[in-house]
């Protein structure tokens, strides 16, 4: 479906009907596979351009997995890229991505859109920020450590509920 430009929603609906699975299971599979092909295409494109390294970018929110937090900002040789090891997706629903490292430096992303963890207000911040820098600056510094821990717990509870949701 991706190669034909088919919308994700259409692929999800077709998979739900064809395989007789719940919509949540179909959505998880389609989104995870889309992430796989997107990142593999990026790796191949980087290789064709002579780019030898890439940087791992975790999604900047409290729902990001521990493994993606740990990998965020790390730089890997392009010829060692392995899905599930150092290349997203690392797990189902993975929202992490990669970016090229050019001439020994990280290619600057112009900016990355993120949401305030309390208000949900959307804003753009510098593109080369790591997860830890984002967390310290936009969660802990802004709301305090106690509130940060409370927000983390809430995000994990939400994530667990979403993961355990039964398909109809």
Model-derived features: where do they sit?
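Activation/maturation switch segments at domain boundaries
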Residues: 17-18, 24, 28-168
């Amino acid at each position: 479906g991706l190669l034909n430009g088919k919308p994700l929603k259409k692929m999800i609906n077709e998979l739900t009907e064809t395989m007789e699975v719940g919509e949540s299971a179909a959505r998880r599979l389609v989104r995870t596979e889309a992430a796989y092909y997107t990142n593999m295409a990026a790796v191949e494109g980087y290789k064709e351009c002579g780019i030898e390294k890439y940087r791992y970018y975790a999604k900047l929110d409290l729902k990001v997995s521990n493994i993606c937090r740990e990998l965020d900002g790390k730089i890997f040789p392009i010829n060692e890229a392995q899905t599930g090891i150092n290349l997203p997706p690392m797990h189902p629903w993975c929202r992490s991505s990669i970016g090229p490292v050019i001439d020994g430096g990280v290619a600057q992303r112009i900016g990355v859109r993120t949401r305030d963890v309390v208000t949900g207000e959307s804003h753009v911040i510098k593109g080369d920020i790591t997860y830890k820098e984002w967390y310290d600056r936009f969660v802990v510094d802004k709301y305090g450590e106690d509130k940060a821990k409370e927000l983390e717990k809430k995000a994990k509870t939400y994530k667990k509920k979403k993961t355990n949701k039964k398909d109809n």
